[in-house]
C-alpha cells in the first residue's frame, strides 16, 4: 500500500500491539463474545494506538504502514479475537477505497477523519440469498439525476452502528 516502514519501527509497533492484546483483549474475549457485546473500549484503544489510520498516508493523518506490517498486525489481532480484526479491516478497506479512488475533495473530507477514528468505514456486502458472493449480489446503485438510488437487501453491514 505505502512505502514499507523500517524493520525496527515494525518491531516496535508489533511489540506495542502484542502488549495491548495480552493486557486488554485476551482477558475479556470469552466474556464479551459469550454475551455478544460490541467491544467499544477495545475499538477505542485501537483508535488511540493509531491503528484506524494504519494504512492511511501520513499526509492525511495516518501511519502509512506497509502492507507487510498491516498484515502482521491483522494476523496478531485475529489470533486473539477475529471479530476485532473485522471491525478494523472493514474500516481500512473503506479508507483504502477513498485513498486510491476518491477525488481530492473526498480525500480531504474523509481520510483525516478515518485516520483519527472520528468516522468509521463500513462495508455492506453480505446479502440474504448469496452471502458474500460478489458475483451473485443483487443490490444496485442507479444514478438518478445528481443522486444514486440504492435498492437491495443486506444481512448486516460491518461497522454500520458507527458510520
Indicate where each model-derived feature is located.
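Short hydrophobic "helix-edge" motifs at membrane interfaces and signal-peptide entry regions
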Residues: 47-48, 93-94, 142-143
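N-terminal glycine-rich flavin-associated loop
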Residues: 82-105, 131-134
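Glycine-rich, Trp-frequent "lid" loop and neighboring beta-strands that shape
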Residues: 62-63, 105-163
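Amphipathic, small/basic residue-rich leader segments at the start of a protein or domain
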Residues: 1-88, 105-116
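A generic signature of intrinsically disordered, low-complexity regions enriched in glycine/proline
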Residues: 13-14, 93, 137, 163
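Conserved short loop/turn motifs at secondary-structure junctions
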Residues: 31-35, 58-62, 94-100, 126-129
Amino acid at each position: 500500500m505505502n512505502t514499507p516502514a523500517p524493520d525496527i519501527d515494525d518491531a516496535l509497533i508489533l511489540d506495542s500491539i502484542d502488549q495491548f492484546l495480552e493486557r486488554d483483549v485476551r482477558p475479556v474475549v470469552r466474556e464479551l463474545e459469550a454475551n455478544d457485546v460490541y467491544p467499544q473500549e477495545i475499538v477505542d484503544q485501537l483508535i488511540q494506538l493509531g491503528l484506524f489510520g494504519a494504512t492511511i498516508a501520513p499526509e492525511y493523518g495516518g501511519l502509512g504502514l506497509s502492507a507487510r506490517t498491516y498484515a502482521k498486525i491483522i494476523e496478531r489481532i485475529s489470533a486473539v479475537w477475529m471479530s476485532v480484526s473485522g471491525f478494523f479491516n472493514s474500516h481500512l478497506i473503506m479508507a483504502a477505497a477513498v485513498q486510491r479512488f476518491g477525488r481530492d475533495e473526498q480525500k480531504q473530507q474523509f481520510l483525516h477523519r478515518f485516520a483519527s477514528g472520528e468516522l468509521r468505514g463500513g462495508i455492506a456486502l453480505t446479502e440474504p440469498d448469496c452471502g458474500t458472493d460478489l458475483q451473485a449480489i443483487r443490490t444496485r446503485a442507479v444514478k438518478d439525476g445528481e443522486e444514486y438510488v440504492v435498492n437491495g437487501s443486506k444481512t448486516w453491514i460491518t461497522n454500520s452502528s458507527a458510520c
